[in-house]
Amino acid sequence: MITKSNLKNTLKSAGFSDTSKDKYEKNYPLSDCSIIVDFKNEKIIYPEDKGFKVNVATTTNFSEPENFVVLECVNRLLDKGYRPENIELERTWTLGHEQKSGRADICVSNQNGKMLFIIECKTFGVEYNKEMKNILSDGGQLISYWQQERGCRWLVLYASNINSSNDIEYTTDSIDCSDDENILNLARKDATILLYKDAHTASELYDAWKETYEQRFSGDIIFRDDSIAYDIGVKPLRKKDLKDFSENDKIVNRFEEILRHNNVSDKENAFNRLIAL
């Protein structure tokens, strides 16, 4: 976990320099901005003069270890080429019938101001795993935010850590918020298929993700080496990314139903027939 006690080592590993007494700074040439971390006043100074938006000041202090994860993630975004005017911390929405407030850690928009992805930051290990379980159970915080920002393209869960060698490590996963074109085609023949575009509540979005997309994750689509800022997406599959289908996968059952419905019994030609359908 990144804490106050190891924050200086984390900043050094991230490319920050000790510019003066108890201040660390990093400049980002791609966007002509900088971040300053003031240890004396326990303050993280983001480039608000360059359009970076901070909605809640508590995310810029040293009070919670999660703030350091947000800092490390923002550093990674700026290194990747995202511009400060497209990054926003702690965007707030009113969620659900109880009018509870929900705040997204990091929102990133495209050059036209449309929401590109929402990042929920957690401390490494227990809290990250806990939120992943929440997402699998009921959609967690991220799908609630998605309901408020239906134009969002991706949902991202993120955590980072500094290890015993003072190397920064991170873990992340993502959900594609777009209906798959193949699924849309199947839905034209099967009205029971749940689609994101037809969902009106967070629970309906979760149901579509669970039932139709089988709680599919897309991995590290933001920070992996071949990902380009503002042009993210699922890259060509690499061998290490492949996962075997199991007989219990619902998508396999769905294919079998379509084959039976169309009287396709020739297993040798089933794939070609399925594509043709």
Model region roles, listed by residue range:
Residues M1-F16, I183-K243:
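Non-catalytic C-terminal interaction segments of nucleic acid-processing enzymes
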